[in-house]
């Protein structure tokens, strides 16, 4: 066996996953899976790391949840993640909540490599009728 083949054999295949970040104005959920999405590696939410209900969607709660999820994933041998950010979407809010950006930064700072970041918020193609009535919400 040549020297090149030995080096290739010694080099271990890197394990990558997908970080699904669901961020609404009520909570932030970080769910890390394998690349297929079938196997859950780690799952944390803002509500699991703070006591007060009003703090669940905060960037601080998202940061702590993402840090814990990243630590769990790295213990299981993951070196990097692709990120899918999702807002409630549909007939609800189409913008991610305050915890989305903080969660992405926390995953990177925890030591996970970041691959692709994409927005997977569901967009209605003439789905259900939005709340607010015929004349909309009057402010």
Swiss-Prot record:
Keywords: Ribonucleoprotein, Ribosomal protein, RNA-binding, rRNA-binding
Keyword Ribonucleoprotein: yes
Designated name of the protein: Small ribosomal subunit protein uS11
SUPFAM superfamilies: Translational machinery components
GO BP terms: translation
Region (Disordered): 117-139
Job description of the protein: Located on the platform of the 30S subunit.
PANTHER family cross-referenced by the UniProt entry: 40S RIBOSOMAL PROTEIN S14/30S RIBOSOMAL PROTEIN S11 (PTHR11759)
Quaternary structure, from the entry: Part of the 30S ribosomal subunit.
Gene label: rps11
Similarity comment: Belongs to the universal ribosomal protein uS11 family.
One Gene Ontology MF term: rRNA binding
Keyword Ribonucleoprotein: yes
One GO location term (cellular component): ribonucleoprotein complex
PROSITE patterns, per database record: RIBOSOMAL_S11
InterPro entries named in the record: Ribosomal_uS11, Ribosomal_uS11_archaeal, Ribosomal_uS11_CS, Ribosomal_uS11_sf
């Amino acid at each position: 066996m040549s020297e090149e083949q030995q080096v290739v054999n010694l080099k271990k295949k890197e394990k990558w996953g997908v970080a699904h970040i669901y961020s609404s104005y009520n909570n932030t959920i970080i769910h890390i899976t394998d690349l297929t999405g079938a196997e859950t590696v780690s799952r944390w939410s803002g509500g699991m790391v703070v006591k007060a209900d009003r703090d669940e969607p905060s960037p601080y709660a998202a940061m702590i949840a993402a840090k814990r999820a990243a630590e769990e994933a790295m213990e299981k041998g993951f070196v990097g993640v692709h990120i899918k950010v999702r807002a409630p979407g549909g007939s609800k809010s189409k913008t991610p909540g305050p915890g989305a950006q903080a969660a992405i930064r926390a995953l990177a700072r925890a030591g996970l490599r970041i691959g692709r970041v994409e927005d997977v918020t569901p967009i209605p193609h003439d789905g259900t009728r939005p709340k607010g009535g015929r004349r909309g919400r009057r402010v």
